[in-house]
């Protein structure tokens, strides 16, 4: 799996039941604007989204592709993730994300920043309404690092990095002495990550978590307000045996 030419798709295939994945919005690419006159039309704009099954349970998945423009976030890239959250919310299904990102696409300027902000806002809005699982599979820095913090369960693959600012920007700290972005530090010291390990180990834990999540979550819309008839957080906390085996 580690040598697969398309890591983003390989992660999805490893997570979901065989032949259950349905990709959505595969033809979406970046658009030309005043900020981005020479937009590159790259495959899926650097992120694969869709839905599939884990032991028969419906889940919605996004996976960033670091092979496309370094996995950077552009306007349409972020809007694809935003639309995935909206679809998952309508049916009360979990959202699972694989992050492998090179930051915001600077050439798209405020369009990319606004779209990224919308994703973070939506993740905050649905917290406790639908389950969110985030796996940092590569680099996750800057504004996108907020997304793992909002997730109900956060995972990191060995060798991945999670940070807002580079460790070297902290006075007196150097990454070769104390890499505060490493999976080991985030798990043992910061406590922001629930599970670390190889990709196979992390995916096994993610599948285990999905198997323990109630599948009768009902979300009712009232204008722009989301009402929680059966709150995911309340149901999950009531399950005393709900933990991740390490």
Mark where each language-model region is.
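Catalytic or ion-translocation cores adjacent to nucleophile or general acid/base/metal-coordination motifs
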Residues: 166-175, 182-186
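Active-site-proximal loop/turn and secondary-structure-junction residues that shape catalytic pockets
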Residues: 101-103, 138-140, 168
């Amino acid at each position: 799996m580690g040598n697969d030419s398309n890591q983003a798709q390989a992660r999805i295939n490893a997570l979901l039941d065989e032949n259950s994945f349905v990709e959505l919005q595969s033809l979406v690419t970046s658009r030309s604007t005043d900020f981005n006159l020479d937009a590159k039309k790259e495959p899926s704009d650097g992120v694969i989204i869709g839905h599939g099954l884990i032991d028969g349970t419906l889940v919605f998945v996004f996976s960033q592709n670091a092979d496309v423009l370094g996995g950077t976030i552009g306007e349409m890239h972020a809007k694809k993730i935003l639309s995935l959250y909206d679809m998952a919310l309508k049916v009360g299904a979990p959202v699972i994300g694989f992050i492998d990102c090179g930051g915001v696409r600077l050439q798209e300027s405020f369009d990319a920043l606004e779209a990224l902000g919308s994703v973070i806002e939506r993740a905050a809005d649905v917290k406790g309404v639908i389950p969110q699982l985030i796996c940092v599979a590569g680099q996750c820095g800057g504004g996108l690092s907020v997304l793992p913090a909002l997730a109900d369960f956060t995972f990191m693959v060995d060798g991945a990095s999670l940070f807002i600012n580079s460790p070297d920007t902290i006075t007196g700290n150097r990454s070769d002495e104390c890499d505060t972005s490493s999976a080991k530090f985030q798990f043992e010291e910061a406590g922001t990550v629930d599970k670390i390990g190889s990709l196979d180990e992390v995916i096994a834990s993610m599948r285990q978590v999905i198997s323990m999540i109630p599948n009768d979550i009902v979300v009712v819309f009232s204008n722009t307000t989301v009402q929680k008839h059966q709150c995911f957080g309340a149901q999950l906390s009531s399950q005393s045996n709900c933990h991740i085996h390490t």
